[in-house]
Design a protein with these regions (language model features):
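Short, flexible, solvent-exposed loop/turn segments with mixed acidic/basic and small polar residues
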Residues: 32-38, 101-106
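Glycine-centered flexibility motif
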Residues: 18-19, 40-41, 80-81
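N-terminal accessory segments
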Residues: 1-37, 65-69, 74
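FAD-binding glycine-rich core of flavoenzymes that anchor FAD
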Residues: 52-156
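Short, basic, glycine/proline-bearing loop/turn elements
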Residues: 36-48
Length: 156
């Protein structure tokens, strides 16, 4: 990976999400770069947007600077898709962790849901239980915080 952390790029990320939600050091980004079960690699930054506008702004700046964007929800590491895979990328990689974007909205009396990027299967199960409904998948990883989006992306 190139690791070209320009001060301007870093400052733009901090301006969007604040210093608390823009992480750059190896130690402070370690848990985001390592899956619980599998996966490990490098990233020049980990960004934790707190709303969809911040998410959009972060993605815009990353794309404009030709960074690789790795969207991360629960980072369970069950499939390896939520962490970088080594250090051999041809460009800098930025992890965007969506754990703060965890809203779920029930639509049409619970017949449909709108799940934000960081929403968990556990939370979805809790919301649907009073309606005698179940989520698209009922799997063991619900209890460790697996995301709705991760479940859909991995066909579970």
């Amino acid at each position: 990976m190139r690791k070209t952390k320009s001060k301007e790029f870093i400052q733009k990320l901090v301006d969007i999400v604040g210093t608390k939600n823009a992480l750059f050091g190896k130690q402070e980004t370690s848990s985001f770069r390592t899956g619980i079960r599998i996966g490990f690699g490098s990233a020049i930054a980990v960004v934790l947007p707190r709303n969809l506008i911040e998410l959009w702004e972060v993605i815009k700046i990353c794309i404009s600077q030709e960074k690789i964007v790795l969207m991360q929800a629960a980072n369970t590491g069950l499939t390896g898709g939520s962490t970088p895979d080594g250090d051999s990328y041809d460009r800098d990689l930025v992890i965007i962790n969506t754990r703060y974007l965890d809203k779920i909205q029930l639509l049409n009396k619970g017949s449909q849901v709108l799940a934000f990027p960081g929403a968990t299967l556990y939370k979805l199960e809790e919301l649907l239980e009073p309606l005698n409904r179940e989520p698209h998948s009922v799997i063991g990883s619900s209890c460790i915080g697996a995301s709705v989006v991760g479940g859909v992306c991995n066909n579970s």
